[in-house]
């Protein structure tokens, strides 16, 4: 079994094989489905606007082209893509071109299986291969699981911006984390 595969036994003790691979544009509908669910149901992404088909393709294409879009899928499932990770532009100014921001999302059924950690590890390597220098994580400060995950992979907390955002009627603090890729 390769480092990007994992066999996980569920309640019925049926082994499922999860595989991480580079995303393609054919994965766009599945990525959009997972991302839009997070838009509706979580505080992880600070927008209430779901992506449509064209918006999802335009957002995903540059990261697919540079090799910093990954998916995790489970063999034999009808909706086999159960998560994704991307490293995309942190800022539009060219001086920030080698600094990217990570985003990792899993469907609820795929959470708690170590797949987020596998995606983050693979994304760090993909970003390194793409020539990126710094990986940034912008995390809702109350999301301790995400903060701990990033710490495990060498990210340090740069700071917390109080009251940086708002979603679902809640005022949210933002934890900024970074990791060198060199």
Give residue spans per PLM region.
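Acetyl-CoA-dependent GNAT
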Residues: 3-4, 25, 49-109, 120-121, ...
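C-terminal "cap" of GNAT-fold acetyltransferases
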Residues: 5-7, 98, 153, 163-182
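A short beta-loop-alpha structural element at the N-terminal edge
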Residues: 19-33
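Conserved GNAT-fold acetyl-CoA-binding loop/helix
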Residues: 32-59
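Conserved catalytic-core motifs of GNAT/GCN5-like acyltransferases
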Residues: 86-89, 94, 136-139, 156-173
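Conserved beta-strand-loop-alpha-helix junction that forms the acyl-donor binding cleft
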Residues: 111, 137-147
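Conserved acetyl-CoA-binding loop-helix of GNAT-fold acetyltransferases
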Residues: 112-127, 148-152
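Conserved GNAT acetyl-CoA-binding A-motif
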Residues: 127-139
